[in-house]
Amino acid sequence: MQRRDDPAARMSRSSGRSGSMDPSGAHPSVRQTPSRQPPLPHRSRGGGGGSRGGARASPATQPPPLLPPSATGPDATVGGPAPTPLLPPSATASVKMEPENKYLPELMAEKDSLDPSFTHAMQLLTAEIEKIQKGDSKKDDEENYLDLFSHKNMKLKERVLIPVKQYPKFNFVGKILGPQGNTIKRLQEETGAKISVLGKGSMRDKAKEEELRKGGDPKYAHLNMDLHVFIEVFGPPCEAYALMAHAMEEVKKFLVPDMMDDICQEQFLELSYLNGVPEPSRGRGVPVRGRGAAPPPPPVPRGRGVGPPRGALVRGTPVRGAITRGATVTRGVPPPPTVRGAPAPRARTAGIQRIPLPPPPAPETYEEYGYDDTYAEQSYEGYEGYYSQSQGDSEYYDYGHGEVQDSYEAYGQDDWNGTRPSLKAPPARPVKGAYREHPYGRY
């Protein structure tokens, strides 16, 4: 009853009616508002009209900001909280940067409040702070591309694990470093990479290593890692990856737990040389048989029918191509001239009496082929003994007596001169005098 007599409500009701019947059409959306939004169930008619009328009656009210489509739904109310307006991208970027800006001071404060005894936590916080200050976190999120045609150098780093857990008794560090560090120096020169041994157990003095590990110096932070080989390569992309592959392949050879391989043997020789111990003879500097060195003289063969060794030249024996095959040579006597038309003497005849020869002299080291070694087995005295026995049967000798001419043809094929395909016995012709005493009297 008091609300009906309330003058404020009466004035708002009258102003609402006058506004709805205004022909100028200043508020054309008044009748459409109830159709879009249903009235609240617990709000009184008078109060609601007064609020709506008061909102329409204020001419200085500004229009609401643009709202997204999700804000104008059936759940949106007139008297509810104002929705958040749309923001430009720059504003959203500033909102995202706020957590990063707060993250760095929080890390700094946490590092200051942390006790220095927490070594690992201090190292992690320091690394994270440096990463944010340098902006590496943004670089990690971005995609990296390699420009193979640019000559810009890049840096590659790899850590190769040393299998000390599988082979705890093998000294990998000593094998990689070598005597006085010469092995790893040569390895760096061959591969073109920077190679170093890092990690737990890389230092010889264990007490000093433990002290440096507890010191917290970032320079010795690698002592908290496992034992490994650190390889660094700097160069253009293609060359850098090729050098890294070559360096890893060479380092792999040093990670084989074998004390008898070539690497360890060379290190032992180098260590003995550095210590002043003479190098053991391994075929160097000792006279051995090879190119340019004469072989040791073999023992002199003894016995009948044993020829000189290969490559030896017996003094007085014929050289290849010097005399006609079948002729005999006496020591120190040149071969006699041959008579034209005379048949070649036969070297081997059935029933030749062989006289044992004295042992040959000591052979000389001379590189020559011993094709004519068999001619030294018989001498001229054998022929004299043979024909001296047969002189009692016949007083003279005829070339055609008891012989066949074909035998000369068969033997002539082995002539050394090679001028005639065959040697035929000439026909018997008279010689000065009826006959000779001996067919080989010219000897």
UniProtKB/Swiss-Prot annotation:
Q: Which residues carry this modification: Phosphothreonine?
A: 33, 84, 183
Where does the protein principally reside? nucleus
Positions bearing Phosphotyrosine: 387, 435, 440, 443
Q: Which GO terms describe its molecular function?
A: DNA binding; identical protein binding; molecular function inhibitor activity; mRNA binding; poly(A) binding; poly(U) RNA binding; protein domain specific binding; protein tyrosine kinase binding
Q: Where is this region: Interaction with HNRNPA1?
A: 351-443
Report the InterPro entries cross-referenced here: BBP-like (IPR045071), KH_1_KHDC4/BBP-like (IPR055256), KH_dom (IPR004087), KH_dom_type_1_sf (IPR036612), Qua1_dom (IPR032571), Sam68-YY (IPR032335)
Q: What assembly does the database describe for this protein?
A: Self-associates to form homooligomers when bound to RNA, oligomerization appears to be limited when binding to proteins; dimerization increases RNA affinity. Forms a trimeric complex in the nucleus consisting of BANP, HDAC6 and KHDRBS1/SAM68; HDAC6 keeps KHDRBS1 in a deacetylated state which inhibits the inclusion of CD44 alternate exons. The complex is disrupted by MAPK1/MAPK3-mediated phosphorylation of BANP which results in BANP export to the cytoplasm. This facilitates acetylation of KHDRBS1 and CD44 variant exon inclusion. Interacts with KHDRBS3/SLIM-2.
Q: Can you say what this protein is called?
A: KH domain-containing, RNA-binding, signal transduction-associated protein 1
Q: Which organism is it from?
A: Homo sapiens
Q: What is the lineage of its organism?
A: Eukaryota, Metazoa, Chordata, Craniata, Vertebrata
